[in-house]
Amino acid sequence: MSSISKRLSLRVSADVIYRGLTDTRLERLFPEFFTGITRKLTSSNKANSELQFTTTTYDSQIQIKEIFKLKVLESNATEIIYTTSTNIANDPVVESIVYMHIANILYALLMLETGYVNGLMERQK
């Protein structure tokens, strides 16, 4: 499978996104949802605002490599360039898994923005 790249702008600071991406509380609190899946931070370059994860499933049969590049835009806004690739090509089942994984990551980032913006609005009241 060739790499898939998505670009997303959020009204959240890069630091909040960085902490959200590296947070592992869900894996620790609900391990039953992560059976057979290992997600490791394989590279972190905070100076260049880049994170790289490797997600391995089912005895390393499927490996998903993810790179997040964070670029600070105007005040409190960040652009995320999210690139995904896998070790298996031309397999519709694996492609389906990867597309669902990408959708979940993008949804989680949008929910991070929603929670962040709502929290700011609550503070201003």
List PLM regions with ranges.
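Intrinsic-disorder/low-complexity, polar/charged segments enriched in Ser/Thr/Lys/Arg/Asp/Glu/Gln
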Residues: 1-7, 16, 50, 63-65, ...
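Hydrophobic ligand-binding cavity/cleft-lining segments
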Residues: 1-38
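A short, structured loop/turn motif at beta-sheet edges
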Residues: 11-15, 43-48, 69-79
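Short coil/turn motifs at secondary-structure junctions
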Residues: 13, 58-60, 73-75, 85-89
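Mature, Sec-exported extracytoplasmic domains of Gram-positive
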Residues: 34-36, 68, 89
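Hydrophobic/aromatic beta-strand elements that line small-molecule binding cavities or substrate pockets
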Residues: 38-43, 55-57, 64-72, 84
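Short, hydrophobic/aromatic-rich segments at coil-to-beta transitions
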Residues: 44-54, 114, 118
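A conserved amphipathic terminal alpha-helix motif
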Residues: 84-125
